[in-house]
Amino acid sequence: MKKNALRIGAVLVSSALLSTLVTPAHAHVSVVPGVSAAGNTTDALTVGRNNTINFRVGHGCSLEKDVIHPKTRRVVASAAIDKFATQAFTVTIPKSAMGEAGATFPRPAFVPGWRTTAKKNEDGSVTIKWRAISNDFALPNGPAGDTGASMYFDFGVRVAFSSATRGQRVSFVAQQTCLVDLPRAKGFPASRLPIYETWDGTADGADTVLDNNSRGPAPTVTVNP
């Protein structure tokens, strides 16, 4: 497990590279500050409205274990080799990043080719989801013909940090979804199997380390005092 810290102005941005027991998952989501409440891209994130943060998805998904076709029992995708494009990305905005008393609804950035939904949860947080409308708009693991390189994209959200977050770390649960194609077989229609990269502050346990849902530290920012 490797961790990186990126300091922009007075904002501390933490990120992590997640590895699995089988092969590095190449999962990397970090938070990059955008525009502060003062409208200045160089200011630290502050309490108030119009703070834009960008969740940078830096890689596609890889596998913790081989994917076996449920009908033919053949290996469809290999944990040691195959990588997959990002088809969906979700992030949960906590109440502490929704203004005083959680009254300011977060505003997601419009991403052409992706559908965006927002759902308010029972605890008052809001989960935002971007989903590619087709494979043509999915975020590939690397440029065509160059499997050794990775592409990235920033999913932006406008938030309002509450006064209780001054000088505090604010974490966001995020999840990246990729799809593995399962070919048609006799008595089995073609389908797609989701695999995940989840950043929620937990780690893979003995019972989950090979479930093709890698886990690691949640992307985090520190609000200016």
Predicted regions and their residues:
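Sec/Tat signal peptide C-region and signal peptidase I cleavage site
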Residues: 21-27
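A surface/secretory-pathway sequence property marking extracellular, secreted
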Residues: 94-129, 219, 225
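Low-complexity, intrinsically disordered segments enriched in Ser/Thr together with acidic residues
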Residues: 133-167
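Bacterial N-terminal signal peptides that target proteins for export
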Residues: 1-10
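Bacterial N-terminal signal peptides
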Residues: 11-20
